[in-house]
Amino acid sequence: MASQEIEALSGALARLPGLGPRSARRAVLWLIKRRETALPQLLNALTQVQELLVECGVCGNVDTSNPCGICTDHRRDQRSICVVEEVADLWALDRARLFTGKYHVLGGRLSALEGVRPEDLTIGSLLDRVAQGGIDEVVLAMNATLEGQTTAHYIAERLEGAAVRVTQLAHGLPVGGELDYLDEGTLAQALRARRPVG
């Protein structure tokens, strides 16, 4: 039987996304075996996160400064905003280095089942950013889920009448994906979004 301290650490780790109780116990055992090297590094990294990281008051990104490095980077396209559900989505898109504008993190997506309403997200501050002017395009980069598409549709409706072009990421076949393994919804979306070759 493990001590209370080990159980407490396992329980804390098990609350992290993607880690269940068994994975958390394995992580704790790994840390115990390497307590002289790995544990101090982990403690230092966690302390740094707690002390230094803040949420950007403009876009919702997590950074060491407010506004964040993306919002203050004048080399980025000031006239386009890419709207994402979560910070992880922002990071994924920015790693691809294809979008060079600014971002806006909603902090989730609309969901009747989970009781998430427009006022629970940062849609209002997005509309304020667009209303201030200087924005030519809003790219809706929501996940290809029912809730994500509902959120995108809601935002597009709210932006009707604004002098801004609203676009959405294309959905369809993943690179390397085999048709045989794809669901009907993905295949249907890929067919609808088809474009000429050449």
From Swiss-Prot:
Belongs to the RecR family. A zinc finger (C4-type) spans 56-71. This is Recombination protein RecR. It comes from Novosphingobium aromaticivorans (strain ATCC 700278 / DSM 12444 / CCUG 56034 / CIP 105152 / NBRC 16084 / F199). The keyword Zinc applies. GO terms for molecular function: DNA binding; zinc ion binding. Residues 79-174 form the Toprim domain. Coiled coil: none annotated. It holds the Pfam family RecR_HhH.
